[in-house]
Amino acid sequence: MKKMSVLGIGPVYVISCLIITILSIYISEKDFLNSGKVYELKDFMVLVGAVCIALGIVLWIKAVISQKMVKAIKNNKLLTTGVYSIVRNPVYSAFYFVLTGLLLIEANLWLLILPILFWIYMTVLLKLTEEKWLLDTFGEEYIKYCSKVNRVFPWFPKK
């Protein structure tokens, strides 16, 4: 059985979303999207954005470093404990939260369309690539895991 790449489809997702995020913030800073700027909510959006970024960093550290994700992938092991018990794709979630946080800090409502598009893009990429591989590799164990744990948004496991 072919092993999954340690990076998976991650670089495609992260690099493309990062480029879009940077360009969007640049465009907003150049006053092309002024109608979406909400100056009266700036402090609140900066706070929420900072929380999202912090959550993303914690998720990444927990998934990659604490749970030795690279070793598990190399050993064809399905991670279902620790941070993986509350979200199936904590590394993707981490980048999603960091990018969303950066967009929130800009305090421009037009930019808040992007996290929705990023979520759709991530869902499609995962379903077409990594989730197929995981299903082929782990079968019923992966199906049960999917029924209990969210793909992207951390939450308490379903019973």
Task: Show which residues each predicted segment covers.
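Short, amphipathic, aromatic/basic-enriched membrane-interface segments that mark the entry/exit
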Residues: L79-N89
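Short hydrophobic alpha-helical membrane-embedded segments
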Residues: R88-F97
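Membrane-anchoring alpha-helices and their flanking helix-loop junctions
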Residues: M1-T80, Y96-K159
